[in-house]
């Protein structure tokens, strides 16, 4: 397979033309957002750890125009030529939101709602619904035509869906005066993550939305959920190190992994409710106390829909140790000690497979290392079998050519820029 290259014309120009062709009118507003890649932290995002993200120079663009019939119609064009058309009414979106409200059983225990299964129209319609309810859009909003051109290859762990979320949200906001202000961008990221968690089939990764909106092209974004800070550190891709996303072409069956991720998130949420804490990371002596609480839950309510003590021990161990690794990587980035990064990334990949139980990318990571990468780590273990490989610049060209010749999808990662409106 040849080395992946971006289309020669911008996604913004193509989405304007596609919207004109499919809707029959010019778009009201257009916005674009970058691909995002995780250095570390995508599986401790919900725990309240540290997520470290980069932006890539591949983008998704969205064009919107208003409707008056209560429908959200989506036309999505992928970089591989696939086209998706989907629609939903805002009334249906409201009904889906109601289904996600938790109940309580006869013993006072919360009843978890079914996992959302929404496709692209429900996902983007959910963003509109949430923006209305969070007073980012007027309640007079009565639907939208949304056209999306996505240049980010799917199943590569580069956050195509999150980029579409952000591009759509910014386009819906149009020419608002304060779209570049950090407080509003933080609010937009929060709204997108909330909507995805309520309506979409794949769980939300908050760090992608935050990085796409608040990152910077020439630096790495560090999101620390202990205090909610979003800061920048010197970029690790430089004259000495190149980075690539590597993936096996084709769709990945991630249904089982998605269910596993949701089960772990429910466990974290239940423990946080039990201890009255916003995140387990902020709970003193969390592993011991949470395991004692879980044992009590087993004793009183049984083990149905609950992890075993062994499973919970492994998860909590991973969360704690991965947060420590993320802290070490953040320190190394800030002090420009690049050689300290790669052992920590290798340890993280090993822990994902052996401790956390997500080994979908393990063989590809091993192959990349064998071919000359100084480190390779899953792009998003569970939902993708892709890896991010870090290669000395002197070997980068041969590395990419060899793996492309083996039939892998090889995407060079260059620094991107944050999401913007394109009006």
Per-region residue spans from a language model:
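C-terminal nucleotide
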Residues: 1-36, 40, 61-114, 224-376, ...
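Gly/Ser-rich oxyanion-binding loop with an adjacent helix/lid
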Residues: 1-30, 34-53, 108-238, 247-249, ...
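Catalytic-core region of right-hand nucleic acid polymerases
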Residues: 52-55, 60-62
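A short, compositionally biased micro-patch
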Residues: 55-57, 67, 151
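A general alpha-helical scaffold signature found inside nucleotide-binding enzyme cores
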Residues: 57, 122, 183, 187, ...
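FabD-like malonyl-/acyl-CoA
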Residues: 162-165, 386-390
